[in-house]
Amino acid sequence: MPLLTIVPPMPGAERRFKPFVDFVHRAGWETEFVRLEWNGDQPNFDSTALFSQVDLQTAGKVVLGYSLGALYAHLGALRARHLILGSISPFFLEDDDEPQRWMISYRAGNAHTPADILVGAKEDEQMHRRATAVRDFYRQHTYTNVLGAEHELWHPNYLKAVATALDRVKARSAKPAA
């Protein structure tokens, strides 16, 4: 079975993500979580240590991040084979409407990594603005505006969008090299 590496958004996510992990297993994928050393209160806008931890554990892998996990994956999984970024949190340098944020541009990711960008159709304007900018950053991407969904990974349409992305990655991996 192919492997999906999940970047947790906060400490304790493995427990909270159990229903999502079960869903991914039913879709024919194994899962693992990136193991992060959390320092201080989260999110810790004064530290970029998580990004290098993500990079060390995601090289060559299919990586999913949701919310803050998507931000960590975008800035950290620089050598991933494929990214699935769900409802990426708007805490980048460019998000000047956020008083607390990382002073790192969303352009610090790897534009050459294939990426699926997802955002709930009912999420606020700021979330859509950031998702669109991240979408446009990646040279090879798909973009899904998940109908009926707010900021909720468990929404049936969000799960369907993730399954579609996983199927696309699996199909691409199965194609013989030309």
Name every feature range the model reports, one short phrase each.
Residues 2-30, 35-37:
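Short, surface-exposed "cap/lid" segments of acyl-processing enzymes
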Residues 38-39, 146-153:
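Histidine-bearing beta->alpha loop at or near hydrolase active sites
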Residues 41-57:
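Alpha/beta-hydrolase active-site loop
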Residues 61-62, 82-84:
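Residue in the alpha/beta-hydrolase core beta-strand immediately N-terminal to the catalytic nucleophile
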Residues 64-69, 73:
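Gly/Ala-rich beta-loop-alpha elbow adjacent to hydrolase catalytic centers
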Residues 85-93:
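Active-site nucleophile loop of the alpha/beta-hydrolase fold
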Residues 94-137:
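The feature captures the conserved acid-bearing segment of alpha/beta-hydrolase catalytic domains
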Residues 154-166:
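Post-His helix in hydrolase/transferase enzymes
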